[in-house]
Amino acid sequence: MELLTFRDVAIEFSPEEWKCLDPAQQNLYRDVMLENYRNLVSLAVYSYYNQGILPEQGIQDSFKKATLGRYGSCGLENICLWKNWESIGEGEGQKECYNLCSQYLTTSHNKHLTVKGDKEYRIFQKKPQFLSAAPTEPCIPMNKYQHKFLKSVFCNKNQINFNHDSNISKHHSTHFLENYYNCNECEKVFYQSSKLIFPENIHIQKKPYNSNECGETSDPFSKLTQHQRIYIGESSQRCNKKCIIVFSQSHLKGHKIINTGEKSVKYKERGKAFTRGLHLGHQKIHTGEKPYKCKKCDKAFNKSSHLAQHQRIHTGEKPFKCKECGKAFNRGSYLTQHQRIHTGERAFKCEECGKAFNRGSYLTQHQRIHTGEKPFRCKECGKAFNRSSYVTQHQRMHTGEKPFKCKECGKAFNRASHLTQHQRIHTGEKHFKCKECGKAFNRGSHLTRHQRIHTGEKSFKCEECGKAFIWGSHLTQHQRVHTGEKFFKCKECGKAFTRSSHLTQHQRIHTGEKPFKCKECGKAFNRRSTLTQHQIIHTR
């Protein structure tokens, strides 16, 4: 059994797992790792202090300056964790860097801390000083160097000196506890995860700090304020999971998001598993709890990060900008999706037909074509759809809602696509051109129909009589001949028709409207076909 390394207590995420965390969870991860690292540093420094190597003030200074960050000269793929003193007489120089899944973190770069050693201040003499202005070198991968954080060469329990840290590592393994460590001074219980324990002699008599809440004595270098945070708001705040550290109050509410006690925790409500611990935010899905409320519109959310994203709608803030075209977004995920337009990347591939998509949601929608799944149902008529947007569009038929209005003529539509198509009438825009004859259309569907004239294709066949049509609407109209269905009824006289166009023509009898006018003689008609017949007179 070896001494503790940072990797023993670190939580590592795969790229896929990291993408599942929202910014608040990523920040919490960083804070937890920082506190774990500081605990390790404090234990290492205390080992030296207990041997009389460091004075008390030096320990306090060292702990305050212990920090976690990236090398200044490293890329975003490395996080820096500084190994303790290398050997007796080591001069000022750079410590090793651990490559620890930080390619997914967003912490700012920090200067590397070095240990200054010279003739006056050797490692095992009086006071090594942490400096924060030293330049840095490229990081060294974790798998190349496996340095220990605890570099004690003196065992307090047996009063034995060791010349090499590996020897004392083997020796110390005999003193480690396997599960829980109880402090006899304050009865605080620490869980020993991956051999992380807190020594009892933390309650030293040299200038102790006392907590006003519980009277517990803390060591001078571990910060009284950290100890006191446990008692803020409640007499005791503890995680009932097996955590490496006791979190500050700001972490207590959400620290279960990353619980390091188990590698996989299964959620009983739906059997969902979280590889790095039980996600507290997931529980809110089942409880319906939404503690984060927007002050502008009173909309509530179960995550603070979701509230932060929502508030950008009110402020208009769009902090995520595309470097290619300059387009800005209020969410990082939207920017990621947008950038795939420039790169042409289609990371989401259908296993059934091989079709690829640039968004996971598009793939999910597409897969319903293969499965036949239609999870979105209309509450009015029970009709089911494979997309939620289709239900929304369909429901407007029942409500009569037409939210999309033309600014030119005021005509309203129940679909945005219908408005777009309509606006081309005003602009004269005809994007869709036939390659055979050059005729252009303002709708893609119209071009598709037109092309069947050239190909002779009649895809829509009547099952009753076998008659085929080039347009689906023509087949629908034809089928009413067999069924006798007449949906379109005149409100004036009650006469019914199989086609809406026939009803429109009929209504002109009641209104007297004659929109079709002859250019030769000015005579007007209520039907186009009647005008066509009339124009033959002028051509004779």
From Swiss-Prot:
Tell where it localizes: Nucleus
What does this gene product do?
A: May be involved in transcriptional regulation.
Specify the taxonomic lineage: Eukaryota, Metazoa, Chordata, Craniata, Vertebrata
- Please give the organism: Homo sapiens
Q: Which one of the record's GO molecular function terms can you name?
A: DNA-binding transcription factor activity, RNA polymerase II-specific
Where does the protein principally reside?
nucleus
| Record-given protein name | Zinc finger protein 519
BP GO terms, sorted: regulation of DNA-templated transcription
A Pfam family annotated for this UniProt entry: KRAB
What CDD domains does this protein map onto?
Answer: KRAB_A-box
Asked whether the UniProt record includes Repeat among its keywords, one would answer yes
Q: What family does the entry list?
A: Belongs to the krueppel C2H2-type zinc-finger protein family.
Q: Which InterPro entries match?
A: Ikaros_C2H2-ZF, KRAB, KRAB_dom_sf, Znf_C2H2_sf, Znf_C2H2_type
* GO CC terms of this entry: nucleus
Task: Give start and end of each KRAB domain.
Answer: 4-78
Which keywords does this chain's UniProt record carry?
DNA-binding, Metal-binding, Nucleus, Repeat, Transcription, Transcription regulation, Zinc, Zinc-finger
